[in-house]
């Protein structure tokens, strides 16, 4: 074979090898991209059952077992996926979107069920923390060893009525309790327009805020996910935290999260580090389980932010939850606080602010204020 023939043959072989390599590379890239996409897909919550108001949401694609959340919420810096150390990172923050705008909500009576029909979605979102008996620091409790609880979502059936984005409330249960124990309060919130994410943990990670924070992460991811029913319906700039007993301890600790606008620990408040928003520190005057010392200490520790110590004299550690066909006095006060600070309900502001505030002049309450002159 001549020299020119050899050169021509080598060129042809090189071209064939390059094409084969490129095809393999493209195939690998497509497979990798498909895997990444599948891992990042979170099934959108399903609509509620109108007759009972509840539904079990399908979470196709929500990876993770034993507390690992790899693959939840997609890829990129906004994902929760990975290890528990990443639990505090939020999904894409979209305060306004195609479906709603942030603004003041219409006035409503906080002591009555709100104007919106509600839906409850069970077992949604990622697993949050370790199960009771699963080992590790601060197990989340739940249905038994190795079982890691998820969340219950309480929301208005119709989203963004009047084009308004829904503020978010994250909830923490008391010891041994699930969201069903607090259903009347959490449904009250939803009937007023709040989207409430409540950990199903019976121990709320034994008083640590992880489940409450992971709940925020998840709803923010849903707000950024076009396949989610919550897509661009949430006001991600107004997020409240509240919880009872051990959940109040978790609320106090979660208050340092920069995304939380206001917090209301109920019968279990502790001194709050890195507080950056108004706080209502509630206790029952007849509470012999945790008493009111923690709430008083939490108020003393506040320096510049608005804070209220609110003791309702006639209730104990559980009787504040009485419903009897209408919300309890405490429900109404907590709901009013959330409406003022998350919905810009200025009509309810005099309930709390000023020396002659509504609660201040109510003999059923013992009120102490800090930085709440106006």
Feature map (PLM): residue ranges:
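Ser/Thr-rich, Pro/Gly/Ala-heavy low-complexity intrinsically disordered linkers and tails
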Residues: 19-98, 130-142
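Short beta-strand element of the alpha/beta-hydrolase
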Residues: 163-174
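Active-site-adjacent alpha-helix of alpha/beta-hydrolase-fold enzymes
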Residues: 275-344
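N-terminal cap/lid segment of alpha/beta-hydrolase-fold proteins
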Residues: 95-164
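Short amphipathic alpha-helix adjacent to the substrate-entry channel of hydrolases
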Residues: 180-199
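Gly/Ser-rich "nucleophile elbow"/oxyanion-hole loop immediately N-terminal to the catalytic nucleophile
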Residues: 160-165, 207-249, 347
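Short glycine-enriched nucleophile-adjacent loop
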Residues: 248-258
